[in-house]
Swiss-Prot record:
Signal peptide bounds: none
Catalytic activity: 7-carboxy-7-deazaguanine + NH4(+) + ATP = 7-cyano-7-deazaguanine + ADP + phosphate + H2O + H(+)
GO terms of molecular function: ATP binding; ligase activity, forming carbon-nitrogen bonds; zinc ion binding
Gene: queC
Biological process, per Gene Ontology: queuosine biosynthetic process
Pathway where this protein functions: Purine metabolism; 7-cyano-7-deazaguanine biosynthesis
EC numbers: 6.3.4.20
Keyword list, A-Z: ATP-binding, Ligase, Metal-binding, Nucleotide-binding, Queuosine biosynthesis, Zinc
InterPro entries: QueC (IPR018317), Rossmann-like_a/b/a_fold (IPR014729)
Keyword Metal-binding: yes
Residues the entry annotates as binding ATP: L13, S14, G15, G16, Q17, D18, S19, A20, T21, C22, L23
Protein name, as recorded: 7-cyano-7-deazaguanine synthase
Domain of life: Bacteria
Its job: Catalyzes the ATP-dependent conversion of 7-carboxy-7-deazaguanine (CDG) to 7-cyano-7-deazaguanine (preQ(0)).
Length: 239
């Protein structure tokens, strides 16, 4: 990975595995990195608690880049719009349009727009998000084409060149675990395994091999499968 120490990044940090890995990726690449979280009225607040533990844990590890301030914005308009299993107390199900009801329409578009506004104020020129087309549920605001178009729109909107980086766009969950290992070794993998939150049902409970969660929701299943694939590959490689 080539380093760009002169650039300053803002990482969208939710408290999950993907965004935590992206934070490590940014610290390995850029000279100065800040973090941004959103309280959007999500049903399960546990991911917001996990954010701070992840930040503290990442700060304790050695990185080429400097980890700067954390920022939190309240965006309760998404909960007001409702209709998603992420904001409303409803069972996870498929919608008539073929998308799961865990999709929060416009969420990533809004998050990146607010991130661009904050980056403008903070003198940051790179926005980093954990979106992926490889292991995802078809969310249209996670697509590479969507985010490339958004980069153009945001740069025009603030009259300043912004780069939207999505280092996991073409990586599977197994690849994401492998990337964390390359970036921060066993210490980072263990931090993400124990402190990040993925479960759609908000469960922490028992610590599984792959981390906390119910083990049955789509997010837990994807994370567990990725862990199993990655650890199996490591065993084959003698790691």
């Amino acid at each position: 990975m080539s380093r760009l120490p002169q650039r300053r990044a803002l990482v969208l940090l939710s408290g999950g595995q993907d965004s935590a890995t992206c934070l490590a990726w940014a610290l390995a690449r850029y000279g100065h990195v800040e973090t941004l979280g959103f309280d959007y009225g999500q049903r399960h607040r546990v991911e917001l608690d996990c954010r701070q533990r992840l930040i503290d844990g990442v700060r304790a590890l050695p990185w080429p880049g400097q980890l700067g301030p954390d920022h939190m914005l309240t965006v309760d308009v998404l909960a007001q719009l409702g209709g998603s299993a992420m904001t409303d107390d409803v069972a996870i199900a498929m919608q008539a349009d073929g998308l799961p009801n865990t999709f929060v329409p416009g969420r990533n578009l809004l998050f990146f727009t607010l991130a661009a506004a904050l980056a403008y104020r903070r003198g940051l020129d790179v926005l980093v998000g954990g979106m992926s087309e490889t292991d995802y549920s078809g969310y249209p605001d996670c697509r590479d084409s969507t985010l490339k178009a958004l980069q153009v729109a945001l740069s025009l909107g603030v009259d300043r060149p912004l780069t939207l980086e999505t280092p996991l766009m073409w990586r599977s969950k197994a690849d994401t675990w492998a990337l964390a290992q390359r970036l921060g070794g066993d210490a980072l993998v263990e931090l993400i395994r124990c402190e990040s939150h993925t479960c759609y049902l908000g469960q922490r409970g028992d610590l599984h091999a792959w981390g906390h969660g119910c083990g049955g929701c789509p997010a837990c299943e994807l994370r567990a499968q990725g862990w199993e694939q990655w650890t199996a590959q490591r065993s084959l490689n003698g790691a």
